[in-house]
Structures are given as structure tokens and as C-alpha cells.
Amino acid sequence: MSAIVDIVGREILDSRGNPTVECDVLLESGVMGRAAVPSGASTGSREAIELRDGDKGRYLGKGVLKAVEHLNTEVSEAVLGLDASEQAFLDKTLIDLDGTDNKARIGANATLAVSMAVARAAAEESGLPLYRYFGGMGGMQLPVPMMNVVNGGAHANNSLDLQELMIIPVGAPSFREAVRWGAETFHALKKILHDKGISTAVGDEGGFAPSVENHEAAIQMILEAIDKAGYTPGTQIALGLDCAASEFYKPGKNGSLVYQLDGEGGLSLSAQQWTDMLAGWVDKYPIISIEDGMAEGDWAGWAHLTEVLGKKVQLVGDDLFVTNTKILQEGIDKGIANSILIKINQIGTLTETFAAIEMAKRAGYTAVISHRSGETEDSTIADIAVGTNAGQIKTGSLSRSDRMAKYNQLLRIEEDLGDVAVYPGRAAFYNLR
């Protein structure tokens, strides 16, 4: 038995300089596991609650001392003596202790910190790398990275409404080569921007945040960068979009909700018109994935988008599903989207995270493991991606050490797996077969 003998929670800073929760879990054997939780900028309304202090005189109200106090008192009392290898029981203990549907009392940032730290300690105790602890002998598939090279929306201060424009190296023979292709394209794009006199400052997730004429201008610059890096758009490197459409779904002039695209000259579009615009881009450019193409509350819009594009491109629900099996099941039943974004802090425990991944796979939906815009050096999501054979990961651009921590961990895992490592490439998009 790997009994938990001590838990220490603390407040640290994330990649945006905002407080977040870190947790150390000590086992009877002397083994320790440490984990830190991420935080999002654009968040779904039904995400598990991230507990913040609200004291405007300290970290602008974003302190997490309350969550840390919960960790060091009642959470510690509840889990001391439990077997760290019994992850599901431990996570149920945390859920029951909180007693709310959305972890509003203790905070998902507190429960997740413990959940991840316990898993790390148990893996260390068992002598297994974390990805192997999660996936057993079956975890050998590296994820295809969706690399956010242009930031907009809530992740940048520019003219773009869409939050992320991504490159996806579907034609690479290995994860190592996929990272190289992405890095070379990133640097080619940087030179293109520099030569045009456009800022090469980066956003929260390491992508560039240029002010350009419109979204197509940004897409065309990315395609130019792919070409200048020596790769073929579509065949070797495809494109993905994260619209984060909830962020620009607003009341129009007559009071009805519309998609307000300031980056397209102030267009106000219905769900049908916005779908038509997306469909036009899909026909024109090698786009194979669209995340949050409609607002989280616009289920009718989602149904129309899925009907029009669901067989052509991956339609990922992030704010739509918030890593929640109840909401995902509703989407599956209604034929909404064909993929789910997996963000561990949207739900607050590893057990619930794995349940969402498994439900998606059973329904033929893909599961894309994802970072948040506020990250730390914690690389747990890299191990989750391989351990669950998810096949896809979103962990930012090719800059900022908080993003590189995940890519570098995946490079180590691929090296550790050796000849049995699998890089699925386009086959990771099995929802489009």
C-alpha cells in the first residue's frame, strides 16, 4: 500500500504572472509527487469553478490562498492514509468532500492539484514513467500537435476575432519530426512578419499576434510560411482554427444574438451565415479542424455547423462540452460536433478527465488533450496524451518555456518508447473516415 502521509499546498505563479495552486503529496515510502494546475482566459460557463480569493488588494483579486487553505486542512484530513494507487477512490473522495456539481466549495484548482500530484507520486512509487502508469502497456501513440502560431481573440490584443490559427504536421513520420516541421514553420512566419514590418510579439500561448487586414490575410501568411519552410500545405502541414465563438457571440442591433466579427470589417452574422463563411474557408484552404465554431449556448448553430461540415473537418467542442461527460453525452445523442477538447482543469480530477476521453472514443469522437492559456512548467498533459492514446494535443506555439515543457516531455517519451512509438499523423482524425 502506498499510503499518503502528507499534503502541502502552495500558491505559485503561472505563465501570465497570476497565482495558481501547486501541491506536493508525500507517501509513506518517502516518495513525493508534485503538480501545478493551469488556468484559462476564455472559459466555458459550465466549467468547474476555479476558486479565487477576490481580494482586490492582492494579485488583483486572483490570489488562491483559499484554495491552498482547503488543501492544507480539510482535503489533507480527508486523504491522509489513503492508498495513492487507488486514483478513482481518491478522486471520488475529493468530489464527495466538495459536495457541489462544479467543485465550487473547495475549488477545481485545489482538487486537480491533489489528483495530479497523487498520480505522480503513485507512478514514482511503482517505478513507472507517468504515461505508462496512466496507460499500462498500451500507451505508445504520440499525439499529433496542433500548434498555435497566430493568436487572436482573448489571447492577444489585435484585430483578429478567432483565438487561434494552428498548423498541424499531419504528414510527419514521427513526433520529433513534427516538432521540427512546426518550429521551422514558426521561424519562417516570424521572418515574413518581420519583413512586412509587422510585430513579432507573441501572445499568451506563444503564437504571434499580428494586426492584419482580416483572417484570410493571416491564413495566407501561414501558408506562405509553410511553403518557405519547405513543406507542402495540406499534404504535410494542415491548418486548424479555434474560433472561441462564444467570445464574439453578442446582441445585434435588433437585440438578437449574432456573431460579431470586428476583424472582418464589423460583420454581424447569423449562425447560418457564419457557417457559410467557415465552409468557404474550408473549401479554399487546407483546414481540417475547427474548435468552438459556434458559441457554447448556440446548440442550433452547432447542429447546423455539424450538418454542413461534420464529414469534412474535425469539429471540436471546448466551451461546448467543458470536459464534462454529462454534457458530452448530450452532444453525442444530438449529433453535435465530432470531437471534444480535454482540459483537465475544466472538470477537476484525473478520473473524470479519463472518463470523458473514453466516452468520446466509444462514440467515434476524437479527444484533443489541451493546455490552457495560463500554464506552468507542469507537463502532466503530455503523459495523459500518450497514456490514453488520445492522438492529438494542443499545447501552444514553438516559443515560451511553459509550452516547450510539454513538447520536450513528449520528445522524451518518444525516445523512451523507441521503436514501438507510433505517430498517427492524419489517422488521428479518425472521426473523418
UniProtKB/Swiss-Prot annotation:
<feature type="active site" description="Proton donor">
    <location>
        <position position="205"/>
    </location>
</feature>
<feature type="binding site">
    <location>
        <position position="318"/>
    </location>
    <ligand>
        <name>Mg(2+)</name>
    </ligand>
</feature>
<keyword id="KW-0479">Metal-binding</keyword>
<feature type="binding site">
    <location>
        <position position="372"/>
    </location>
    <ligand>
        <name>(2R)-2-phosphoglycerate</name>
    </ligand>
</feature>
<dbReference type="GO" id="GO:0006096">
    <property type="term" value="P:glycolytic process"/>
</dbReference>
<keyword id="KW-0324">Glycolysis</keyword>
<feature type="binding site">
    <location>
        <position position="163"/>
    </location>
    <ligand>
        <name>(2R)-2-phosphoglycerate</name>
    </ligand>
</feature>
<keyword id="KW-0964">Secreted</keyword>
<feature type="binding site">
    <location>
        <position position="394"/>
    </location>
    <ligand>
        <name>(2R)-2-phosphoglycerate</name>
    </ligand>
</feature>
<dbReference type="InterPro" id="IPR029017">
    <property type="entry name" value="Enolase-like_N"/>
</dbReference>
<dbReference type="InterPro" id="IPR020811">
    <property type="entry name" value="Enolase_N"/>
</dbReference>
<dbReference type="GO" id="GO:0004634">
    <property type="term" value="F:phosphopyruvate hydratase activity"/>
</dbReference>
<dbReference type="Pfam" id="PF03952">
    <property type="entry name" value="Enolase_N"/>
</dbReference>
<dbReference type="InterPro" id="IPR020810">
    <property type="entry name" value="Enolase_C"/>
</dbReference>
<dbReference type="InterPro" id="IPR036849">
    <property type="entry name" value="Enolase-like_C_sf"/>
</dbReference>
<keyword id="KW-0456">Lyase</keyword>
<dbReference type="GO" id="GO:0000287">
    <property type="term" value="F:magnesium ion binding"/>
</dbReference>
<feature type="binding site">
    <location>
        <position position="291"/>
    </location>
    <ligand>
        <name>Mg(2+)</name>
    </ligand>
</feature>
<dbReference type="InterPro" id="IPR000941">
    <property type="entry name" value="Enolase"/>
</dbReference>
<dbReference type="Pfam" id="PF00113">
    <property type="entry name" value="Enolase_C"/>
</dbReference>
<dbReference type="GO" id="GO:0005576">
    <property type="term" value="C:extracellular region"/>
</dbReference>
<feature type="active site" description="Proton acceptor">
    <location>
        <position position="343"/>
    </location>
</feature>
<dbReference type="GO" id="GO:0009986">
    <property type="term" value="C:cell surface"/>
</dbReference>
<comment type="similarity">
    <text>Belongs to the enolase family.</text>
</comment>
<comment type="function">
    <text>Catalyzes the reversible conversion of 2-phosphoglycerate (2-PG) into phosphoenolpyruvate (PEP). It is essential for the degradation of carbohydrates via glycolysis.</text>
</comment>
<keyword id="KW-0460">Magnesium</keyword>
<dbReference type="InterPro" id="IPR020809">
    <property type="entry name" value="Enolase_CS"/>
</dbReference>
<keyword id="KW-0963">Cytoplasm</keyword>
<comment type="pathway">
    <text>Carbohydrate degradation; glycolysis; pyruvate from D-glyceraldehyde 3-phosphate: step 4/5.</text>
</comment>
<protein>
    <recommendedName>
        <fullName>Enolase</fullName>
        <ecNumber>4.2.1.11</ecNumber>
    </recommendedName>
</protein>
<feature type="binding site">
    <location>
        <position position="343"/>
    </location>
    <ligand>
        <name>(2R)-2-phosphoglycerate</name>
    </ligand>
</feature>
<feature type="binding site">
    <location>
        <position position="373"/>
    </location>
    <ligand>
        <name>(2R)-2-phosphoglycerate</name>
    </ligand>
</feature>
<dbReference type="GO" id="GO:0000015">
    <property type="term" value="C:phosphopyruvate hydratase complex"/>
</dbReference>
<feature type="binding site">
    <location>
        <position position="242"/>
    </location>
    <ligand>
        <name>Mg(2+)</name>
    </ligand>
</feature>
